Amino acid sequence: NKCDDRITRRVYLSKEKEVSIKVVYFINNVAAHNNTIEIPQTVNGGYDFSHLSLKGIVIKDEDLSNSNFAGCRLQNAIFQDCNMYKTNFYYAIMEKILFDNCILDDSNFAQIKMADGTLNACSAMHVQFYNAAMNRANIKNTFLDYSNFYMAYMAEVNLYKVIAPYVNLFKADLSFSKLDLINFEHADLSRVNLNKAILQNINLIDSKLFCTWLTNTFLEMVICTGSNMANVNFNNANLSNCHFNCSILTKACMFNTRLYRVNFDEASVQGMGISILRGEENIPIDSDTLVTLQKFFEEDCTSHTGMSQTEDNINAVAMKITADIMQHAD
């Protein structure tokens, strides 16, 4: 068959081969008379796909642990039910790639360029995503414990039912993103850009959001108990049923902000700038009296502090969020 960019073939892998495997599919850098290439094994027992340009490959139920895809160009590729432990994708380019029910723990996705990629029902713990470009990525039903997204560009990403305690998102860009049913407990979201994002059912207990940008952001049922949110920017945001009790909000900004049933009990609010939108009226509030204005907020229905939310109540809500995330997890 001629080597045509419209031709896609399934990749066949077999760990029973001692030295190498044969892969039959379209590869840009294979001569027109031969679209079969042998993929050598790496020193760690995986396969070396490095710097190949692969289109339309489908790999199912294979052991690709310790394989090397560094510098690869992967277009419309599918990896399903694969063990990809410690796989290297450093500097790979991915277009509409799908990882479905794969083990990606301890893998390297640093400095990848991914567009419209999907991680579904994957285990991606301790993975390096630093400086990765993952715009419009779709990550759902996935474990991201302890993974590193330092300075990752993830604009317009969709995160749904994700377990990600201790994840590092320092200086990441998640603007215009949608996050729902996420466990970010003990995570670092400092200096993260969440402008114009939608956050719903988020557990951020004991997390860091120092100097994080949340302008024009919608937050509903976001629990930040005991979190460090100093210098965070909520300007023009809309907050509903959120909990900031026992958190540090020193020098935080909440100008032109709409608040409904927001809990600031025992929060540190020194130097906080806040003005609440009530209809078209913008009402400035002294941060020193913020927590004591319960009656005003109840009647105004703009915000509600002192909601009789005990620590046990709030922990129960956080546990329910985690339980909802885990409902369909294996």
Positions of the model-derived regions?
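Tandem repeat scaffolds
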Residues: 2-3, 7-8, 12-17, 24-329
